[in-house]
């Protein structure tokens, strides 16, 4: 059986931590930021953990 390929879209969007959790960037922070409150843009900064229901599917795409 050939080697499974990593889903390239998933590899760009998700990252696995050292403990095996999958994290992602939050949405709504790419452009058109000037009319969004600073409070909102601060809240959207950083990474957040993927929901438990989505994790197995993403893990499969990342060949985990």
Curated annotation (Swiss-Prot):
The gene is rpmI. Pfam families: Ribosomal_L35p. Coiled coil: none annotated. Belongs to the bacterial ribosomal protein bL35 family. GO terms for biological process: translation. This is Large ribosomal subunit protein bL35. Keywords: Ribonucleoprotein, Ribosomal protein. GO terms for cellular component: cytosolic large ribosomal subunit. Residues 1-20, 37-64 are annotated as: Disordered. InterPro entries: Ribosomal_bL35 (IPR001706), Ribosomal_bL35-like (IPR021137), Ribosomal_bL35_CS (IPR018265), Ribosomal_bL35_sf (IPR037229). HAMAP family: Ribosomal_bL35. GO terms for molecular function: structural constituent of ribosome. It comes from Mycobacterium sp. (strain KMS).
